[in-house]
């Protein structure tokens, strides 16, 4: 590992001397509000009229009655059929304004959508292969993307009138596709991981690769970051979770409780906990900072003869308001759990628009009001779910 003096100074010590000023949130709100002006200037994309807006009914399986049964069931409100020209594996919501979101697809494009009416506002091109990961900065008007083309790209969404487009930086170093990215909440530092099994740490301004975190032996599938130690958590197809010590550039804790590959991991937005889901349909809940196992739910609640080894969990999302955990499966199944108790509240099947071979749910996110859930699918569609709260 080679570390430049500048990047080493950035990462060797997470202390007050390198933290941003306390008005970071105000600055972030200012920067993101400017995106509204950016959207208002954009003409409607010619592709917008080609999106087939469909509404389907969720095929629901009633969960057993329990004390924490939801006040209202989640229902499919809208389907954006043909939202992309290939599978959609990445989604990110602007958490500051809650007004727009972005999706990335096998068609190598990134699309920006208006959340209020789900209209297409812009299409970003530059990647030459499919998009696997997206991340929106809360501190700058930047969008970061990672793709099968082994590259990371930074997009300045305020440079809409530039002849060169709004891509302002690219980061090269990965030897395979980039499947997950994450931004440090306080520093201008980007984390990326993917097929080459290495977590790479970047100074987003200088594009310097500040350090590499080694240890995983298979694809890295998720990266979560936090203000507090451990500041970086990663999951992998090798079935492990690693909590990293950035000061020492090494694994602080290795979690090996999963028996199958881990496809998704998600930190709770308000609690010092996180969850991980594997290809056997098992979801495990962990307590930070020591990584203690708090709860197990998913197929672990079923008897052995009910287990289905094909129950691959591709995506997890946590509702910031209702504390509901969503899990999306490779065969199109959906499940909603009480995050605190682990009890199953609702399950169902999302019907595929292109046959069972393309029924997978690949990515998901709740909006900041907790009233909407966005899911991305193998059949090229985006779906919006809601409740009657």
Curated annotation (Swiss-Prot):
It comes from the Eukaryota. The keyword Repeat applies. It holds the Pfam family WD40. GO terms for biological process: mRNA cis splicing, via spliceosome; mRNA splicing, via spliceosome. InterPro entries: G-protein_beta_WD-40_rep (IPR020472), Prp46/PLRG1-like (IPR045241), WD40/YVTN_repeat-like_dom_sf (IPR015943), WD40_repeat_CS (IPR019775), WD40_repeat_dom_sf (IPR036322), WD40_rpt (IPR001680). SUPFAM superfamilies: WD40 repeat-like (SSF50978). WD repeats lie at residues 83-123, 126-165, 173-212, 215-254, 257-298, 308-347, 356-389. Its main location: cytoplasm. GO terms for cellular component: catalytic step 2 spliceosome; cytoplasm; post-mRNA release spliceosomal complex; Prp19 complex. The keyword Cell wall biogenesis/degradation does not apply. It is found in: Cytoplasm; Nucleus. Keywords: Cytoplasm, mRNA processing, mRNA splicing, Nucleus, Repeat, Spliceosome, WD repeat. Belongs to the WD repeat PRL1/PRL2 family. Associated with the spliceosome. Involved in pre-mRNA splicing and required for cell cycle progression at G2/M. This is Pre-mRNA-splicing factor PRP46. The lineage of its organism: Eukaryota, Fungi, Dikarya, Ascomycota, Saccharomycotina.
